[in-house]
Amino acid sequence: APTDMYSFGL
């Protein structure tokens, strides 16, 4: 997902 725990949606 784009805004996951490690992917901060950057």
From Swiss-Prot:
Leucine amide PTM sites in chain numbering: L10
GO-annotated biological processes: neuropeptide signaling pathway
Disulphide bond pairs: none
Domain of life, per lineage: Eukaryota
Record's GO cellular component terms: extracellular region
Keyword Secreted: yes
Keywords noted in UniProt: Amidation, Neuropeptide, Secreted
Protein location: Secreted
Similarity remark: Belongs to the allatostatin family.
Record-given protein name: Carcinustatin-19
Lineage: Eukaryota, Metazoa, Ecdysozoa, Arthropoda, Crustacea
